[in-house]
């Protein structure tokens, strides 16, 4: 459990550093970017290795009815992330699209995984994403969203990217022994 918890903590600190210690982070200047990047890479390694090693209690098991909801939430999360990159219309209504996608992803995984490792990983990242949104909202003014027409190329690009990413991630899950469809 130590590696997994350390990975989630390192991820959170690396991402929140700018918000909780802005003066210290700004003093680091450009030299701090590689350190933050290495911290994030290290956190992913720790979370991946740690998740596989945690052996603990299971509070609930996967219910077949929730698998479809899980998959839909993950797909919507991928769409929101892709939309943030393509400028699709939904981003006019979602202030923090990437953090919103992480929250959807975490909740989706908590619906179908009630083991200790999942609670630490997905619960920890959910807490981080909620905290990040709160800190950003306190520090930054709400941006004025410009009225713009829907550009269907962007919409289809985001939708297509979400489907492709969902398929690739689903395939990788299966290869790693975590099937997404039951």
Question: Model-predicted segments: where are they?
Answer:
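Membrane-anchoring alpha-helices and their flanking helix-loop junctions
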Residues: 1-95, 100-182
């Amino acid at each position: 459990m130590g590696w997994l918890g350390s990975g989630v903590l390192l991820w959170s600190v690396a991402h929140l550093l700018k918000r909780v210690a802005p003066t210290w982070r700004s003093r680091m200047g450009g030299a701090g970017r590689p350190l933050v990047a290495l911290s994030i890479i290290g956190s992913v390694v720790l979370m991946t290795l740690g998740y596989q090693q945690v052996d603990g209690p299971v509070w609930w098991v996967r219910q077949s009815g929730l698998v479809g909801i899980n998959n839909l939430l993950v797909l919507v999360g991928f769409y929101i992330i892709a939309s943030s990159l393509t400028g699709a219309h939904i981003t006019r209504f979602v202030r923090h699209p990437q953090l919103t996608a992480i929250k959807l992803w975490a909740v989706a995984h908590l619906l179908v995984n009630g083991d200790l490792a999942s609670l630490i990983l997905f619960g920890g990242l959910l807490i981080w994403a909620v905290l990040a949104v709160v800190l950003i909202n306190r520090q930054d003014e709400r941006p004025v969203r410009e009225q713009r027409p829907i550009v269907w190329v962007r919409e289809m690009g985001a939708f297509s990217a979400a489907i492709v990413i969902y398929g690739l991630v689903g395939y990788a899950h299966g290869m790693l022994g975590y099937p997404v469809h039951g």
